[in-house]
């Protein structure tokens, strides 16, 4: 074999599933690399930094931003190599040596004995509103995510969308904003029942069968002053003065990496990796964790992603070293943490 920097496992994606994969592979003493398309670690949780996350076992309700901080710290425990701003565009295999070759959009090449795909819902970008000139307001008061609830305090906010995220944002903002409006093309909202009920009982003013047709700028033409709504049933228009506009029309995802792979990675619904409960794909040596993995009994929670990650790493370890233990030793009795535990205990007994 010619001289290459060969890793035991390369993890594509650095959300909760990818970061826990990195931690667990370090626990199993594997040479690990993480490749992330975004300029930072944490994945889609960054879209909801102030939303409370309740369903991670052992954690009290935690804001998304805090959860990111914790999972990043854990994921980097064993110092994996981290590559940010890197989009993997193809995966192939060296037929002579058996290792995988990952090529990026920049032309960089990575070599790995195994791969864990942990890209969540894929490379996501918010679906933009199709109104001429809308992009110029993106630097002022046209928003595609809610990064800070405080930013909207005492403001008049218009939200466009009727799914879970739009309803969540409306419920979160209604108590602190001056006024919240929500416009949706359909007759009724499509979110979870409890969230819809909460919104219906709040002071949020909903405009159904309606959509934004125009942004009216202020005198300096750098901010949205009001929005024009069209009711497609009555064909009537109305105008609402606003301070902020939030668009939540879903996300566009780039799934070309898997769809156009030269390897026989079987997909479900032309996107998700068809796998097993042990995180195995249809290609030996390629595993999956998190939302991208599909199998009967799949748990679509962050907690489920952690189990996927551990399974993927254990199978990757045994793929490389067939006589390796099926799982890592639990952390409470693992010698790898002996020195770290001494340092932590000193902090606790001060």
Tell me the role of every PLM-derived stretch:
Residues 75-104, 109-112, 174-275, 324-331:
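A Rossmann-like FAD-binding core segment of flavoenzymes
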Residues 22-24, 46-47, 127-131, 170-172, ...:
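Short amphipathic alpha-helical segments
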Residues 338-350:
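Acidic, Ser/Thr-rich low-complexity intrinsically disordered segments
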Residues 1-12, 27-28, 40, 81-155, ...:
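FAD-binding core/adjacent interface of flavoenzyme oxidoreductases
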Residues 7-78, 167-193:
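Beta1-alpha1 glycine-rich phosphate/pyrophosphate-binding loop at the start
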Residues 167-169, 292-335:
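A conserved FAD-binding loop/helix module that cradles the flavin
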Residues 20, 43, 125-126, 168, ...:
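Glycine/Thr-rich phosphate-binding loops of Rossmann-like dinucleotide-binding domains
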Residues 130-153, 244, 248-303, 311:
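FAD-site-proximal beta/loop scaffold in flavoenzymes
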């Amino acid at each position: 074999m010619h001289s290459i920097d060969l890793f035991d496992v390369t993890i594509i994606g650095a959300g909760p599933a990818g970061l826990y994969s990195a931690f667990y592979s370090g626990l199993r003493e594997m040479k690990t690399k993480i490749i992330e398309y975004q300029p930072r670690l944490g994945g889609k949780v960054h879209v909801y930094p102030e939303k409370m996350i309740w369903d991670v076992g052992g954690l009290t309700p935690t804001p998304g931003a805090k959860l990111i901080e914790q999972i990043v710290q854990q994921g980097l425990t064993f110092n994996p190599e981290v590559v940010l701003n890197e989009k993997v565009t193809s995966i192939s295999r060296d037929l002579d040596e058996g290792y995988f070759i990952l090529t990026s959009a920049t032309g960089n090449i990575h070599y790995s004995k195994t791969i864990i795909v942990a890209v969540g819902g894929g490379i996501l970008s918010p679906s933009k509103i199709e109104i001429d000139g809308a992009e110029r307001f993106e630097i002022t008061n046209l928003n595609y995510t809610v990064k800070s609830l405080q930013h909207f305090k005492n403001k008049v906010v218009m939200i466009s969308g009727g799914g879970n995220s739009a309803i969540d944002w409306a419920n979160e903002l209604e108590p602190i904003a001056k006024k919240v409006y929500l416009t949706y093309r359909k007759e009724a909202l499509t979110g979870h029942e409890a969230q819809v009920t909460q919104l219906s009982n709040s002071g949020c003013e909903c405009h159904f069968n309606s959509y934004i047709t125009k942004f009216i700028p202020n005198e300096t033409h750098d901010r949205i002053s009001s929005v024009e709504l069209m009711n497609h049933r009555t064909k009537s228009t109305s105008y609402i003065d606003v301070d902020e506009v939030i668009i939540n029309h879903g996300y566009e995802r780039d799934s070309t990496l898997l769809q156009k792979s030269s390897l026989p990675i079987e997909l479900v619904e032309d996107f998700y990796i068809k796998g097993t409960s042990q995180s195995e794909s249809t290609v030996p040596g390629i595993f999956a964790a998190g939302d991208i993995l599909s199998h009967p009994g799949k748990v679509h929670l962050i907690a489920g992603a952690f189990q996927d990650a551990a399974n993927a790493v254990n199978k990757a370890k045994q793929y490389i070293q067939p006589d390796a233990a099926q799982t890592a030793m639990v952390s409470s009795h693992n010698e790898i943490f002996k020195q770290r535990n001494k340092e932590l205990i000193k902090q606790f007994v001060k």
